[in-house]
Amino acid sequence: MKHFDTIVIGGGPAGMMATIASAFYGQQTLLIEKNKRLGKKLAGTGGGRCNVTNNGTLDDLLAGIPGNGRFLYSVFSQFDNHDIIAFFEDNGVKLKVEDHGRVFPKTDKSRTIIQALENKIQELGASILTNTEVVSVKKVDEQFQVKSSDQTFTSDKLIVTTGGKSYPSTGSTGFGHDIARHFKLQVTDLEAAESPLLTDFPHKALQGISLDDVTLSYGKHKITHDLLFTHFGLSGPAALRLSSFVKGGEIAHLDFLPNQSQENLKNYFEENREKSVKNTLKALVPERVAEFLAEDKADSKVKQLHPKDLENIISQLKDMEIPITGKMSLAKSFVTKGGVDLKEINPKTLESKKVPHLHFAGEVLDINAHTGGFNITSALCTGWVAGIQSPWD
């Protein structure tokens, strides 16, 4: 059995950064990944461009992590989004900032980010073992025994970075939760987060339409971001973010023009009373949305509208009701809500309170963040903090 100071299970962003951090601090480190290549799920993020972080403030970060984000105060005091940016720039990756603070590599290729992480792991002398699935983990005489189908390794410290259960085709099968349960740690219920929404709505007429900076809300939760109408309902950042707060059976409200008041819109229609309803609406929303809202009044002039019809159009622009029937399954969601119970974890070190030198990082924890760079930020930062902890204390 070969012995390492630290073994990391799971080669996503948290695992790669944990490996880098532990190797940087002098730990002989092994990273084990079940897929043929590291970063399989990371490769598909940001439409394959890899939205590696967000350049916002600490408050922005916490707002972008609705699922227990405040647990990360101590983590972010040690390593935050600005450290992520500095890390990649120091390692030769040129970055750019797009709308909503989203940070991407200038190459627009996720491979650039993955390659930088892999290169750093190799530069620091850590070992990588891919195409290797861990089948069991146990602790014997203060050492962890990690078994694959044909090998056994031991370590003084173990970091579990196996992700949640979303997109299992990328390797996220929930194995890390099984490890936690083996060591008698609590795991909270798992459900879909950052999931497209299923709706009871005549959405086929709007299928494929993308809207910029609209407001989608349910109760006290208001999300202003981009939205996409699909054949099944709603997707895009606004829908994905709202999915953390709904289960099905709710009524969501869509404001196409959050920067316009109803009074302003009344004045706008009055100023354009000689134009057709469709053309008047086209100046505000995409043409197919204009046709959808105008219904059979599209070719009528605004001045010909009955006051109640005009009132209804304005009401639809500002407060369209969309019944939510459910969410995509956990397997088709971007993020897992739930995970290793944070009551079990030291927030400063991400170490188990019950099992010394057992650490968890990334989405395996009960932390869920929005798309837009927040989920990867959480993974990279928790990975770093778990990695820097000494296996010899």
Residue ranges and their predicted role:
Residues 2-14:
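Beta1/beta-strand and adjacent pyrophosphate-binding region of the FAD-binding site
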Residues 130-143:
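A conserved short coil-to-beta-strand element within the FAD-binding core of flavoproteins
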Residues 7, 23-47:
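Glycine-rich FAD pyrophosphate-binding loop
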Residues 2-4, 148-157, 223-224:
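Core beta-strand elements of the Rossmann-like FAD/NAD(P) dinucleotide-binding domain
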Residues 36-38, 43-44, 52, 58-59, ...:
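An anion/pyrophosphate-binding glycine-rich loop and adjacent beta-alpha core
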Residues 129-130, 291-368:
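A glycine-rich dinucleotide-binding beta-alpha-beta segment and adjacent secondary-structure elements
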Residues 7-9, 32, 134, 153-169, ...:
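Short hydrophobic core segments
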Residues 49-97:
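Glycine-rich active-site loop/strand segments that organize a redox cofactor
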